[in-house]
Amino acid sequence: MGAAYHFMGKAIPPHQLAIGTLGLLGLLVVPNPFKSAKPKTVDIKTDNKDEEKFIENYLKKHSEKQDA
């Protein structure tokens, strides 16, 4: 057999340690696919109410186009 690490009385081959390490890193690095995403909001600050309405309507209209 080849060289092996002895951990808690058991012989563990190096390739199993490598696979376990890569698997653990993969689980820690990959983001959670089941996590709910918060919808993005835009904070509109204008002095003019007409500008504010125009921007809100523009964003609403173009966000509907992206959804379709």
Curated annotation (Swiss-Prot):
Membrane topology classification: Single-pass membrane protein
Organism from which the protein derives: Saccharomyces cerevisiae (strain ATCC 204508 / S288c) (Baker's yeast)
UniProt keywords, alphabetically: ATP synthesis, CF(0), Hydrogen ion transport, Ion transport, Membrane, Mitochondrion, Mitochondrion inner membrane, Transmembrane, Transmembrane helix, Transport
Family indicated by similarity: Belongs to the ATP19 family.
A UniProt-annotated Pfam family: ATP19
Name of the protein described by the UniProt record: ATP synthase subunit K, mitochondrial
Residue ranges the record marks as coiled coil: none
Keyword Transmembrane helix listed: yes
Entry's Gene Ontology BP terms: protein-containing complex assembly; proton motive force-driven ATP synthesis; proton transmembrane transport
